[in-house]
């Protein structure tokens, strides 16, 4: 019983952190909308200021997302480390699948951030999911 209570308390702490992450995602959505307006203005006016602001916003957005993606990948990895020899094959498989998915999302975040930094012409479309 004490083990399950500890596990429940740990899960509740994770949920609290995830709730903060949802708030950050709302901010990311607002920033993305604003970045799109800067991109649109650049396309219509060829304003270098709008272009630079768009690039800076995209770098900021993907930097924050990368931190979030890292959190989830690390959390999934920690779940693997907590597996016990008696855990079911299904539990083991699902924990590894969760880690692989989280790790691939982290890799995509790294790639998108690199694109945002390197793409001076802003002609490569990138988006977070």
Predicted feature descriptions by range:
Residues 1-129:
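Glycine-rich, hydrophobic membrane-spanning regions of integral membrane proteins that mediate transport
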